[in-house]
């Protein structure tokens, strides 16, 4: 009975209001839970609060990760990875991504950028048993944290196996959780903070260049800082700062006076070393620590030594209008500052560039300054500017240019100025690059110049791309600006105010120039050392700042010794890379007006050899709108500029092979050099000088090409070709004599068609390249020439059916002249020789099989028709 009553009580109907209330509560709970997991997972963060607290309230909160056994660190074997940095960016145009790349480029470190995948394919990380990357950088560390399980495991295994570290940045925004745990790590983040007074942890193991003795007083830029907190032994603070306000950070288990803004993960948690930044690179100390992080995580493979060589040039000595020149007190200050700087830079010496014509052309007080400067002549280094400060590219006659230099040299001799420094600078860097041949010759003739410098190679901006090169026996060094120009002579009138100049020096552009370049030549001017003496102020403050914040060892050398040191560090820069002077307005302004870019060819026939390039050269020359180069006395119709030593003769030498353009716009020059095709240097060089050029290559069966080259060498009495049969040549092993292997390479390597065309494709768009069927050029030249004319876009199309005739005696097509006669190629073309033996053909068919398959894929990708011989070869491989 009682059981029955209880049952009836439980079975009473529930009131509708209570049901609705329960449903509403469940909905709220569901929304909260969904937001908790979805939002936290998407951000790669897990909310931090009391629920994350350890059962022991006296102990700072820890993650379950802390309870896992510590994994032993695998020693870094840097020999197993290539010195390449993989940079994952948010987009190709993101500011932080560009700043990361800029530092790597300035340091001349090789890198590869990839859009960071949330899901999808990870770039190939290994090549056989080698790692392709020595360091991974994430612009947004959450893209790493939120990788799908497959790619995350792939990347982490790679980092552990090859000892590769990770650098990551966390940039908070308005949607960031104020306090959260980084998913999967015993690390807590507190975001959107304003910070001040940044200091460096002197115990941080990654510090190399950074000197940890000082505190950067004042507010850090922005209110979106993130600080890191953990009690796991794997995390070591690198930079620390205070909060702007005295309030404690919510959810922070310990009220610390200093908070970690850059943290180093020693790899004790999962075997991977990392460095994490709580903001971007806007703060100058982050740039400095980033450089150290790259060095540390790569075992100093990607690192510059601590030595920095500095040379300060003062151009325009004696030049300048009244009121801008140096007076007696300014000259004394120059000398005193030099002595002061020598306490930090052994033998530091200002390098003075003079134009003697303007001596004693100031006020009386300024003329006295000139006299005092000359009385100190032995205290400084000296170099010649131009006598009258004229730009050398305006002198088209070398003898006139030499006369100007001779006047300056006489002035130097008369006043005891040294004339054997071997260094000179041209006003406005005119004539140095683009090269004015007359300047280089006159410099050597009058002064014996061995070194100069310019800010124009390869371009003025961005400055991090400036390089050196060697031309005509003169070493050219990159020159840097320092924020001072001829018009910046008063501190309070500095553009943007004095704070802008101080910002450039203290952690800004000038500081970074020295930080990221082992050798820096700075351009200043006479006017920077009069009035407020901004030149002295700038370099005293710079040296003080460098000594305070870095372990860099500042040194100096005279210009010639400095040049040798530069090319000892960067030997790969000796070879210049000539560029189109008309593509850069500054270059065009300092290039002789007697020269024109219209004299450059618009078409190159690049080969390869023995495919019909000479025939195409002849056929193109028949067109009234097309003009070929003048023949070379050494290499016949070929200039062979881009692939060998002729390149070092410069673009003036190259242009001499082409006519001076007429006033018509229809001038279309072309050249043919068949060994450009397989040259490793030619594609990059051509693209630099002729970025809009059209490229034509002719392909025949590579086996036939190899055999033709062998027969060509026999006809020219090559002793190796005479001694060995074709089969012996192509089958020669690695132990064969060197000259035999050289002939083998010239027979076989040009036939790697896909390899060579891909190299050209790295520098030219597919629509700039035309691949011709050499077999059709031989049998149906008129039809092929119609294709060529369409490719070139010539307005006056020529009907080659009417201008070409087959010569049965020669066995190929020739130019048809008036009266029915023909003009054919010389007797060296179209030679008859025995057919290739079947064993050799079979060997070469197998040898080139994979190359031909790759060629077919490449031509399909380029949208080009497959040559008839290639279709036949592919059919035979099935």
Curated annotation (Swiss-Prot):
Please name the GO terms that the record assigns under molecular function: deacetylase activity; heparan sulfate N-deacetylase activity; heparan sulfate N-sulfotransferase activity
Q: Where does adenosine 3',5'-bisphosphate bind?
A: 610-614, 708, 813, 829-833
Q: Which Gene3D superfamilies match?
A: P-loop containing nucleotide triphosphate hydrolases
Q: Which cysteines are joined by disulfide bonds?
A: 814-824
Q: In which pathway does it act?
A: Glycan metabolism; heparan sulfate biosynthesis; Glycan metabolism; heparin biosynthesis
Q: What is its EC number?
A: 3.5.1.-, 2.8.2.8
Family in the record: Belongs to the sulfotransferase 1 family. NDST subfamily.
- Protein task: Essential bifunctional enzyme that catalyzes both the N-deacetylation and the N-sulfation of glucosamine (GlcNAc) of the glycosaminoglycan in heparan sulfate. Modifies the GlcNAc-GlcA disaccharide repeating sugar backbone to make N-sulfated heparosan, a prerequisite substrate for later modifications in heparin biosynthesis. Plays a role in determining the extent and pattern of sulfation of heparan sulfate.
What name has this protein been given in UniProt?
Bifunctional heparan sulfate N-deacetylase/N-sulfotransferase 1
């Amino acid at each position: 009975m009682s059981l029955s009553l209880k049952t009836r009580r439980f079975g009473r109907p529930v009131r509708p209001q209570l049901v609705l209330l329960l449903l509403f509560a469940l909905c709220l709970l569901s929304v909260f839970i969904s937001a908790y997991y979805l939002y936290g997972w998407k951000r790669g963060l897990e909310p931090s609060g009391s629920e994350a607290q350890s059962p022991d309230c006296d102990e700072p909160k820890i993650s379950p990760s802390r309870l896992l056994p510590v994994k032993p660190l695998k020693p870094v074997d840097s020999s197993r990875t290539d010195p390449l940095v993989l940079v994952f960016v948010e987009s190709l145009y993101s500011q932080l991504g560009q700043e990361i790349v800029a530092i790597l480029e300035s340091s001349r470190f090789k890198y590869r950028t990839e859009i960071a995948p949330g899901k999808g394919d990870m770039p190939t990380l290994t090549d056989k048993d080698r790692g392709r990357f020595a360091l991974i950088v994430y612009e947004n560390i959450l893209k790493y944290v939120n990788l799908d399980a497959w790619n995350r495991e792939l990347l982490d295994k790679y980092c552990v196996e090859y000892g590769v570290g990770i650098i990551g940045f966390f940039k908070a925004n308005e949607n960031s959780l104020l306090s959260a745990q980084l998913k999967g790590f015993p690390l807590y983040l507190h975001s959107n903070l304003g910070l001040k007074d940044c200091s460096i942890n002197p115990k941080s193991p990654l510090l190399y260049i950074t000197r940890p003795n000082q505190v950067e007083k004042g507010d850090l830029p922005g209110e979106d800082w993130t600080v890191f907190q953990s009690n796991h032994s794997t995390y070591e603070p690198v930079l620390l700062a205070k909060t702007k306000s005295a309030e404690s950070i919510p959810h922070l288990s310990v009220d610390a006076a200093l908070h970690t803004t850059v943290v180093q993960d020693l790899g004790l948690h999962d075997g991977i070393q990392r460095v994490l930044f709580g903001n971007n690179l806007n703060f100058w100390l982050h740039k400095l620590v980033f450089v150290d992080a790259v060095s540390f995580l790569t075992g100093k493979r990607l690192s510059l030594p601590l030595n920095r060589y500095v040379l300060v040039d003062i151009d325009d000595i004696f030049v300048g209008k009244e009121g801008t020149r140096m007076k007696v007190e300014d000259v004394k200050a120059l000398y005193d500052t030099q002595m002061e700087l020598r306490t930090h830079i052994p033998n530091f010496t200002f390098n003075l560039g003079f134009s003697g014509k303007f001596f004693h052309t100031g006020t009386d007080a300024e003329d006295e300054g000139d006299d005092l400067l000359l009385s100190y002549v032995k205290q400084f280094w000296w170099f010649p500017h131009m006598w009258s400060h004229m730009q050398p590219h305006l002198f088209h006659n070398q003898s006139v240019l030499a006369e100007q230099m001779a006047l300056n040299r006489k002035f130097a001799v008369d006043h005891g100025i040294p004339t054997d420094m071997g260094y000179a600078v041209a006003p406005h860097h005119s004539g140095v690059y683009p090269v004015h041949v007359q300047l280089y010759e006159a410099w050597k003739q009058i002064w014996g110049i061995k070194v100069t410098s310019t800010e124009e190679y390869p371009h003025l901006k961005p400055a991090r791309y400036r390089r050196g090169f060697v031309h005509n026996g003169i070493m050219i060094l990159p020159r840097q600006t320092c924020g001072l120009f001829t018009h910046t002579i008063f501190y309070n009138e500095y553009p943007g105010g004095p704070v802008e100049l101080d910002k450039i020096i203290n952690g800004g552009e000038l500081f970074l120039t020295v930080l990221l370049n082992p050798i820096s030549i700075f351009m200043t001017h006479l006017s920077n050392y009069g009035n407020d003496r901004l030149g002295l102020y700038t370099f005293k403050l710079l040296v003080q700042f460098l000594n305070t914040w870095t372990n860099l060892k500042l040194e100096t050398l005279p210009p010639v010794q400095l040049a040798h040191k530069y090319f000892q560090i960067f030997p790969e820069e000796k070879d210049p890379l000539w560029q189109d002077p008309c593509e850069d307005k500054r270059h065009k302004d300092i290039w002789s007006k007697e020269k024109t870019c219209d004299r450059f060819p618009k078409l190159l026939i690049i080969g390869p050899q023995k495919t019909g390039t000479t025939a195409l050269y002849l056929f193109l020359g028949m067109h009234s709108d097309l003009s070929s180069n003048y023949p070379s006395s050494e290499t016949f119709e070929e200039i062979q500029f881009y692939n060998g030593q002729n390149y070092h003769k410069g673009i003036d030498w190259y242009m001499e092979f082409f006519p001076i353009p007429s006033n018509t716009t229809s001038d279309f020059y072309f050249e043919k050099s068949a060994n450009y095709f397989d040259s490793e240097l030619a594609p990059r060089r051509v693209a630099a000088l002729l970025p809009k050029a059209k490229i034509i290559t002719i392909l025949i069966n590579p086996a036939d090409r190899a055999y033709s080259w062998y027969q060509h060498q026999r006809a020219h009495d090559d002793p190796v070709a005479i001694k060995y049969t074709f089969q012996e040549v192509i089958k020669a092993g690695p132990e064969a004599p060197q000259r035999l292997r050289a002939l083998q390479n010239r027979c076989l390597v040009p036939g790697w068609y896909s390899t060579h065309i891909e190299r050209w494709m790295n520098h030219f768009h597919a629509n700039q390249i035309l691949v011709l069927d050499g077999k059709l050029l031989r049998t149906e030249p008129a039809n092929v020439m119609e294709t060529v004319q369409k490719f070139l876009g010539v307005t006056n199309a020529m009907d080659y059916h009417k201008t070409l005739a087959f010569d049965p005696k020669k066995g190929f097509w020739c130019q048809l002249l008036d009266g029915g006669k023909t003009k054919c190629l010389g007797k060296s073309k179209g030679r008859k020789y025995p057919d290739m033996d079947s064993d050799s053909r079979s060997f070469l068919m197998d040898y080139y099989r994979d190359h031909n398959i790759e060629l077919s894929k490449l031509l399909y990708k380029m949208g080009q028709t497959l040559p008839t011989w290639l279709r036949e070869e592919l059919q035979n491989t099935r």
